[in-house]
Amino acid sequence: GIDGMVVIGGDGSFRGAQKLADAGVNTIGLPGTIDLDIACTDYTIGFDTAVNTAMEAIDRLRETSNSHERCSVVEVMGRSAGYIALWCGIANGAEQILIPEKFDNNYDKLIEEIKNNRASGMTHQIIVNAEGIGHSYGLAKKIEEATGIETRATILGHLQRGGSPTARDRVYASVMGAYAIDCI
């Protein structure tokens, strides 16, 4: 028989875990989602790896944006949470970071900032766009039409779910896993 169940995941996994617990199965849930959007937790397994994977991709995009003097709109995952975009944007020194929690859909203001940056001598720009805002290809087209600056969109997508786990994710997963076994 089954003595207990350790469920690693996000909201959907936890809903399933709750059904098991309601049926009398000794169940514990560990927060595991790149989105960092689980209530009542400060950290989720996978978030750090996703941020680092996206950060490395954005570093490479900055190089080509710089050499071609273009604007790059980079869409990162996160569903309706902007944590990946925020962390990547700060870590990569993005000129703009668009997250669902704060962006008011004022594209005119965004375009004005891009124009001002170009006028002040900035030759390239990175805009990190959260998945919850989306429409990166349309945004890139809108920016290029309004500014005349060559603008490309890159959607990192499931690339962020791959790669080797960071040391932080490995340690947190190990500690949480050991604690979960003790709790069962």
Where are the model-predicted features located?
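Accessory alpha-helical/coil subdomains and C-terminal extensions
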Residues: 7-9, 19, 26, 47-154
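C-terminal binding/interaction regions
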Residues: 2
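Short gly/pro/ser/thr-enriched loop/turn and capping motifs at secondary-structure boundaries
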Residues: 14, 33-38, 104-106, 158-161
